[in-house]
């Protein structure tokens, strides 16, 4: 199982309860990650060829991709590697607009940066993750409140307040944070799930505009299921 998400940890627990042998693989990009039950390996495979070799050498019968919805490279590698074994992709449902939301969806992080560049000066709450900060590095007009799990390792916005934190977050906490920093605009990826959804509720309550980066498409021929139960059914364990 390619993991690193809350859904992957829930699936690991379900497999362990059924005494199904499995290995969870984490990319190792986040410090002190929450670990699933069972055997865990950390680190990459060396592209699709390396993953295919691991699947072959370890006599893997099924692969589950339960990585982050924006881990497009890992998903592409899994699709390329799993030519002889079934691949099940687990993706939590994305977020949907509700009455009162002021969302603007964009296809890429670069499009989000371009949209911010055209916005009135103010404070931008940027929650897209540390790997995407370079897209905003040329913006000298806005101040950024950047929240990431780990410190940035690439270029960052020149006017930035960095907040290191890990969810889940509460509505009251997000409201207090946005008010304290006088946030005018929220930028987020459509990660889905409940751990970080409170920021969207806070933005709605504050009537704040939100730029939402859409998920990358799945590889051709690959479909996804949205629940642990659906994965278990695909594996014949439901």
Where are these regions (language model features)?
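N-terminal basic/disordered segments at the start of proteins
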Residues: 1-28
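Internal active-site segments that recognize and position negatively charged phosphoryl groups
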Residues: 110-145
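Histidine/lysine/aspartate-rich catalytic loop segments that bind and position anionic ligands
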Residues: 136-168
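Glycine-rich, highly charged phosphate/nucleotide-binding loops
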Residues: 38-58, 164-173
């Amino acid at each position: 199982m390619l993991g690193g998400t809350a859904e992957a940890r829930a699936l690991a627990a379900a497999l362990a309860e059924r005494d199904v042998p499995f290995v969870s693989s984490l990319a190792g990009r986040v410090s002190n990650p929450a670990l699933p039950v069972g055997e865990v390996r950390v680190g990459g495979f060396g592209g699709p060829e390396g993953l295919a070799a691991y699947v072959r050498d370890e006599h893997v019968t099924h692969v589950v991709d339960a990585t982050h919805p924006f881990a497009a490279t890992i998903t592409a590698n899994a699709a390329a590697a799993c030519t002889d074994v079934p691949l099940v992709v687990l993706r939590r449902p994305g977020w949907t607009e509700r009455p009162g939301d002021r969302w603007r969806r964009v296809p890429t992080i670069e499009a989000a940066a371009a949209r911010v560049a055209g916005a009135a000066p103010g404070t931008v709450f940027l929650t897209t993750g540390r790997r995407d900060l370079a897209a905003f590095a040329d913006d000298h007009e806005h101040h950024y409140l950047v929240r990431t799990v780990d410190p940035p390792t690439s270029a960052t916005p020149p006017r930035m307040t960095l907040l290191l934190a890990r969810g889940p977050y509460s509505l009251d906490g997000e409201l207090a944070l946005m008010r304290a920093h006088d946030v005018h605009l929220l930028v987020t990826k459509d990660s889905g799930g409940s751990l970080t959804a409170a920021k969207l509720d806070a933005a709605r309550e504050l009537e704040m505009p939100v730029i939402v980066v859409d998920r990358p498409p799945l590889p051709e021929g690959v479909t996804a299921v949205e629940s642990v139960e659906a994965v278990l059914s695909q594996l014949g364990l439901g």
